[in-house]
Curated annotation (Swiss-Prot):
The keyword Aminoacyl-tRNA synthetase does not apply. This is Allergen Asp fl 2. One of its GO terms (molecular function) is IgG binding. Keywords: Allergen, IgE-binding protein, IgG-binding protein. Signal peptide: none annotated.
Amino acid sequence: FDKNQPWGVIRDLNVVNFKR
């Protein structure tokens, strides 16, 4: 994800949590 994009970080966390 891009650190410049806050929503990118949140989205990445959601994807990891979902896969987990």
